[in-house]
């Protein structure tokens, strides 16, 4: 499996899907903008509201997955990563992924208490392309 190819694929996507587990043990999926920061295939950083349902779910159960896909005319490519999601509220993490214009979502700026960072740590993945799938480990 060419992990560098998967990284390039992920970087081209504008949307990602994150999955959390609710208090009844059911998966919940949400479309998000692409990650704000990525370190290899191991770490992904997203911004979200501290008050969101998803944040509460990750605090209760950190098991998570993220998914990226592209649908072309004749083929579909998808990458699922499994791991854990951590909710970060420290200022250093918030500063790290803050973007100009984020005040549209977080009125009080980078120090807004309703702004937090989701840090996804991947353990394994599954790649799909042309009716073929391949599992891979992330070290």
Question: Which residues make up each language-model segment?
Answer:
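A short, aromatic/hydrophobic, helix- or strand-capping loop or linear motif
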Residues: 20-22, 69-70, 107-113
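Residue-level signal for well-ordered, solvent-exposed loop/turn and beta-edge residues enriched
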Residues: 26-28, 84
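Short glycine-rich loop/turn motifs
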Residues: 15, 29-32
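Short, surface-exposed beta-edge/turn micro-motifs
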Residues: 13-15, 42-44, 61-64, 113-115, ...
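A short, Trp-centered hydrophobic/proline-enriched beta-strand micro-motif
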Residues: 8-24, 64-68
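Charged, gly/pro-rich active-site loop segments
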Residues: 79-139
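Charged, amphipathic alpha-helical segments
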Residues: 1-4, 48-54, 99-104
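A short mixed-secondary-structure module that forms the rim of ligand-binding clefts
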Residues: 35-73
């Amino acid at each position: 499996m060419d992990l560098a190819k998967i990284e390039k694929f992920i970087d081209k996507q504008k949307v990602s899907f994150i999955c959390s587990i609710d208090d009844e043990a059911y998966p919940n999926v949400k479309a998000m903008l692409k990650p704000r920061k990525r370190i290899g295939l191991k770490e992904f950083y997203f911004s979200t509201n501290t008050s969101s349902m998803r944040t509460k779910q990750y605090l209760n159960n950190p098991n998570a997955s993220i998914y990226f896909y592209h649908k072309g005319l004749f083929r579909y490519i998808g990458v699922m990563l499994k791991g854990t999601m951590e909710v970060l509220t420290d200022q250093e993490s918030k500063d790290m992924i803050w973007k100009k214009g984020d005040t549209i979502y977080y009125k009080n700026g980078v120090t807004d208490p309703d702004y937090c960072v989701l840090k996804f740590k991947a353990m394994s993945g599954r790649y799909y392309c042309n009716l073929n799938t391949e599992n891979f480990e992330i070290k």
